[in-house]
UniProtKB/Swiss-Prot annotation:
It is an enzyme of class 6 (ligase). Its main location: cytoplasm. GO terms for cellular component: cytosol. The keyword Aminoacyl-tRNA synthetase applies. GO terms for molecular function: aminoacyl-tRNA deacylase activity; ATP binding; leucine-tRNA ligase activity. HAMAP family: Leu_tRNA_synth_B (MF_00049_B). It comes from Aliivibrio fischeri (strain MJ11). This is Leucine--tRNA ligase. A motif ('KMSKS' region) lies at residues 618-622. Keywords: Aminoacyl-tRNA synthetase, ATP-binding, Cytoplasm, Ligase, Nucleotide-binding, Protein biosynthesis. It catalyses: tRNA(Leu) + L-leucine + ATP = L-leucyl-tRNA(Leu) + AMP + diphosphate. The lineage of its organism: Bacteria, Pseudomonadati, Pseudomonadota, Gammaproteobacteria, Vibrionales. The keyword Cytoplasm applies.
Length: 858
């Protein structure tokens, strides 16, 4: 091996070896335990960022570790290639999304290879190819025939100037990002998949996901939002149909003083027809898209419709208000309002002078006061007629029973989860395989006419989707009759909901090859950001159950174990421009002065401007604080970047990018390289004779095997990769100081270095591969992970700490099997101990076996 560690030459050579030998190409092998490791696949944006590097390094570390455990490891990669950014880039660069996407894939693929990730490139695919989305289209038609797909009108963001639908991220402060026109809500027909039919199973099966972070499971439970309540009807004067509402608090029913309905409710539309003021308010509400998260803090507004609803039990008439906090997308679009016992209802009632009637009082008999705020706790009913004195559950059951007996309500289970709207009015997505014939009937495209191919040679005007603008593209036939294609495309979450399964058989002439899929699935380790907790991870779980029910897979869940890696943070700097806005400056263009504690005192950019330090924040283009992985690999080598990524922070916590830390990782690798070089340069070593080791040699070997045990547990079970690396570093410090005079010294060092190199292999595969060869071994990629020798961990001697009146006063080295009497005797005779006990009377001696002798004296 070369004396100097030169990663650039070394890494290229070893990457070529992996390519030539197809090292990471795998097939099913019934005789080997499989391990499927998957990192969330990237969107081909053009360049890898450090968030990608962290995600894929974690995946590669897990994969290589499992490989050395003797498992049949599959680690695939591909491209989540459809999506809005490609359309925006195409408009900006005056090209089509397809060539931009394919060029980016090629560039990013090379970047991934330079980082040494052990992918099975034979399984690579991009979701924007017909070979991939063709099976998605066919599966969608099968779901349609099963009754799991339907079409209904739903609201979208509409720009009246451009006459186009906008994605949520294209709406800025309520206006179109392109022309600044106020955005409206427009109802159009869209396709939905019935995820709600699987709501209970999706909820229940979370209990089986022992390998998932509790936080993600909690987020999904809340998103699914199961609640038990009562569905009840309020008749409306002058209307045939009653208002249906759902409540989880039927015990408060006698305190209802108004009913709130959403602006999109049919009753609101009807009431506003002859009421211009109400019509204007309804329009305002409908064009103000409110996220559910904002409901608690937004200003509550409403308007009386003039309609009166009739209380289902006491017959009292209450006003019906259109209210901006009632959403049509959730529940029935109508709520019963109890201002005395719901804070939102209280604020609204206070604002509009509506009655506040308390009907629940504290169980402990304390005074009830609803003058300043609602009393929202459960309690005992009063002023509720026959239900007075009942506690929550008794009242719930009794009121539900009475409503049911009178045909005005029933107990029901409700879910917050809504069906999955999969239509997007964009171009760069998979075409939805449905057609409409001239009689207005909708039909799925027959399997023999799939895929419906998205034309790639298009011109983007930045306004209308090319397949909507091209009237000829939509023209087709169905059973010989003229028909029009659906010009909406699938939500890109569709492609990412089943890609993990396609990797098992990427060339299959069906969505999956069941035999191969059931060998590899479920994924043993999935790695990705927690931001995907409620969308991608839920849709993938749903899709897996659809695949199971269609007979393709036998497992219930797609991902056994989930690791959500933390974000990568970096220093961010800005100066204020003439208009008062922030101009962000790249950290690489900033010179920093620090105080004695390392805090930034002054920062100046390359133009001589003093800039403000905004702190350590997430790397992003908008803050101009991203660090190009390519530059770091060119400067330090892939192994150093990988090692820093795994060492700088626990995998599930944020990582603060510090180039000084990268330099530290590089120095450590060089130290390992140097010791291996020095050791191998001295020639071959004799066999290690463990029976004739000296005390010091036994102690060093014990450290080696303790480290193997710790690193194996840290990587394999705990996934605390940073502590595994810290343990290897600690061992290296001892090896650097170890004597190398005798033949057995060198034999012991040989065993230790082989263990160190193998343990570093998942993090630093290139350097480890070369050092392994230098140590006289062959092909580290198919080697076996080091195992610790139980006998080496057995200690001949123990160090006992002697404490006198709570202070450390002496240390005793005793035989590992020394008795308590022997330790007491030695402790009381120890010179240091005797010095501190002089003139004192011993009151108590406490012995903690193998660790501590505690003497209390006065």
């Amino acid at each position: 091996m070369q004396e100097q560690y030169n990663p650039q030459d070394l890494e290229q050579k070893i990457q070529k070896h992996w390519d030539d030998n197809k090292t990471f190409v795998v097939t099913e092998d019934a005789n080997k335990e499989k391990f499927y490791c998957l990192s969330m696949f990237p969107y081909p944006s053009g360049r890898l960022h450090m968030g990608h590097v962290r995600n894929y390094t974690i995946g590669d570390v897990v994969s290589r570790y499992q490989r050395l455990q003797g498992k049949n490891v599959m680690q695939p990669i591909g491209w989540d290639a459809f999506g809005l950014p490609a359309e925006n880039a195409a408009v900006k660069n005056k090209t089509a999304p397809a060539p931009w996407t394919y060029e980016n894939i090629e560039y990013m693929k090379n970047q991934l290879k330079l980082l040494g990730f052990g992918y099975d490139w034979n399984r690579e695919f991009a979701t924007c190819t017909p070979e991939y989305y063709r099976w998605e289209q066919e599966f969608f038609t099968k779901l349609y025939s099963k009754g799991l797909v339907y079409k209904k009108t739903s609201s979208v963001n509409w720009c009246p100037n451009d006459q186009t639908v906008l994605a949520n991220e294209q709406v800025e402060d309520g206006c179109c990002w392109r022309c600044d026109t106020p955005v409206e809500q427009k109802k159009i027909p869209q396709w939905f998949i019935k995820i709600t039919e699987y709501a209970q199973e999706l909820l229940d099966d979370l209990d089986n996901l022992d390998g998932w972070p509790e936080m993600v499971k909690t987020m999904q439970r809340n998103w699914i939002g199961r609640s038990e309540g009562v569905e009840l009807s309020f008749a409306v004067n002058g209307e045939e149909s009653p208002l249906e509402v759902y409540t989880t608090r039927p015990d408060t029913l006698m305190g209802v003083t108004y009913v709130g309905i959403a602006a999109g409710h049919p009753l609101a539309e009807k009431a506003s027809q002859n009421n211009p003021e109400l019509a204007a308010f309804v329009e305002e509400c409908r064009n103000t898209k409110v996220a559910e998260a904002e409901l608690a803090t937004m200003e509550k507004k409403g308007m009386d419709t003039g309609l009166r609803a009739i209380h289902p039990l006491n017959g009292r008439e209450v006003p019906v208000f259109v209210a901006n906090f009632v959403l049509m997308d959730y529940g029935t679009g109508a709520v019963m309002a109890v201002p005395a016992h719901d804070q939102r209802d209280f604020e609204f009632a206070t604002k509009y002078g509506l009655d506040i009637i308390p009907v629940i009082k504290p169980e402990d008999g304390s005074d009830l006061d609803v003058s300043e705020a609602a009393y929202t706790e459960k309690g005992v009913l009063f002023d509720s007629g026959e239900f007075d004195g009942l506690a929550f559950q008794e009242a719930f059951d009794a009121i539900a029973a009475k409503l049911e007996a009178e045909g005005k309500g029933k107990k029901t289970v409700n879910f917050r989860l809504r069906d999955w709207g999969v239509s997007r009015q964009r171009y760069w997505g998979a075409p939805i395989p449905m057609v409409t014939t001239e009689d207005g009937e909708v039909h799925p495209v027959p399997a023999d006419q799939l895929p419906v191919i998205l034309p790639e040679d298009v011109v983007m005007d930045g306004v209308t989707s090319p397949i909507k603008a091209d009237k000829e593209w939509a023209k087709t036939t169905f059973n010989g009759e003229p028909a029009l294609r659906e010009t909406d495309t699938f939500d890109t979450f569709m492609e990412s909901s089943w890609y993990y399964a396609r990797y098992c058989s990427p060339q299959a002439d069906d969505i999956l090859d069941p035999e191969k899929a059931n060998y590899w699935l479920p994924v043993d380790q999935y790695i990705g950001g927690i931001e995907h907790a409620c969308m991608h991870l839920l849709y993938s779980r749903f899709f897996h159950k659809l695949l199971r029910d269609a007979g393709y897979v036998t497992s219930d869940e797609p991902f056994k174990q989930l690791l959500c890696q933390g974000m990568v943070l970096a220093d961010a700097f800005y100066y204020t421009n003439d208009k008062g806005g922030k101009e962000w400056v790249a950290p690489t263009d900033v010179t920093i002065e620090r105080d004695a504690k390392g805090r930034i005192e002054k920062a100046v950019d390359d133009q001589g401007r003093e800039v403000e330090h905004s702190g350590m924040i997430k790397m992003s283009k908008s803050k101009n604080n991203g660090i190009d992985p390519q530059e770091m690999v060119d400067k330090y080598g892939a192994d150093t970047v990988r090692l820093f990524m795994m060492f700088a922070s626990p995998a599930d916590m944020t990582l603060e990018w510090q180039e000084s830390g990268v330099e530290g990782a590089n120095r450590f690798l060089k130290r390992v390289w140097k010791l291996v070089h020095e050791h191998t340069n001295k020639g071959t070593t004799e066999a290690l004779d463990t029976s004739s080791l000296t005390g010091d040699q036994k102690a060093l070997r014990r450290d080696v095997h303790k480290t193997i045990a710790k690193v194996s547990d840290d990587i394999g079970r705990r996934q605390t990769f940073n502590t595994a690396i810290a343990a290897i570093m600690e061992l290296m410090n001892k090896l650097n100081k170890a004597p190398q005079e005798s033949a057995q010294d060198r034999a012991l060092l040989d065993e230790a270095l082989k263990a160190v190199v193998a343990m570093l292999y998942p993090m630093t595969p290139h350097a480890s591969f070369a050092m392994w060869e230098a140590l006289g071994e062959s092909d580290l990629d198919s080697a076996t992970w080091p195992t610790f020798d139980e006998n080496a961990l057995v200690e001949d001697e123990k160090t006992i700490v002697v404490m006198i009146n709570g202070k450390l006063r002496a240390k005793l080295v005793v035989a590992a099997d020394a008795t308590e009497e022997h330790v007491r005797e030695l402790g009381l005779k120890d010179e240091n101990a005797m010095k501190f006990l002089d003139g004192l009377t011993i009151r108590k001696v406490i012995y903690v076996p193998g660790k501590l002798l505690n003497i209390v004296a006065n």
